[in-house]
Regions:
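Zinc-dependent metalloendopeptidases
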Residues: 4, 11-251
Length: 251
């Protein structure tokens, strides 16, 4: 009898999908929308999904950065590969900090994958946890937050493209899918493949089974940011549109 009970418990356990470590690191229930530590120009705990003005863009489209002491050579190579995507396709330039007052400190010894949105002034941290965040796609995603971008699936027009199944969302975390009612249009249509789009099971009560984000187009399969290795052209276009004036100042 005892053996039968143990086998039954084991069968249930094996049938329960395991949340990938990369998803656990990205979907932090303690952070705004899972991976946003704060928003430039807004009080902690009172975030709205929008940067309020160009004052919170990086001057000249240049983002100085340093690596924290925890970042090893392999992690640096992954993060630098993510930065190269910006350099190859946008006017944004990540440069090693010298004496700049505003800069990113990129660390791998904090908890989870997260960033502030926009420049908050002074040193601002960007976390790419060793356990779950060392992916090129994740690095690009968090760096896009740092220069001022939000999640694609929270755009104000998202209901034309996806259905949010709130009945499948973990209790208390429906706010992670709040639409950006202050969304700033920067010239591109909704893109399911955006590096800023979450996957099908974001904040799901039952990973791998209970879908939370379902495309209205049945032919679309949502891919997690950490499973992508580049930004979409629409992402690059939005960056160049948002930073057109800032980057022009650099020339």
């Amino acid at each position: 009898m005892m053996l039968a009970v143990l086998l039954a418990v084991a069968a249930v356990a094996s049938a329960t999908p395991t949340i990938p470590r990369a998803a656990q690191a990205m979907y932090n229930p303690k952070l705004f929308q899972g991976d946003i530590m704060g928003i430039a120009g807004q009080e902690p705990g009172h975030e709205r999904a929008a940067i309020l003005g160009d004052d919170y863009l990086w001057s000249g489209g240049v983002v100085p950065y340093i690596f924290g002491p925890s970042v090893d050579s392999y992690q640096k190579s992954v993060i630098l590969a993510g930065m190269s995507d910006f350099h190859d396709r946008t006017c944004i330039r990540f440069v090693e900090r010298t004496t700049e007052a505003n800069y990113l400190e990129i660390v791998t010894n904090d908890s989870g994958c997260w960033s502030y949105v926009g420049t908050i002034g002074g040193m601002q941290r960007l976390s790419l946890d060793t356990y779950g965040c060392i992916y090129k796609g994740t690095a690009i995603h968090e760096l896009m937050h740092a220069i001022g971008f939000y999640h694609e699936h929270c755009r104000n027009d998202r209901d034309d493209y996806v259905t949010i199944h709130y009945e499948n969302v973990q209790e208390g975390y429906a706010y992670a899918f709040d639409k950006d009612t202050y969304w700033r249009y920067v010239g591109e249509d909704y893109n399911y493949a955006s590096i800023m789009h979450y996957g099908t099971y974001a904040f799901s009560v039952n990973w791998g089974i209970a879908e939370t984000i379902v495309p209205t187009d049945p032919n679309v399969i949502l891919v997690e940011a950490y499973d992508k290795d580049h930004m979409e052209q629409s992402d690059a276009n939005q960056i160049n549109n948002l930073y057109a004036s800032e980057c022009a100042r650099r020339k």
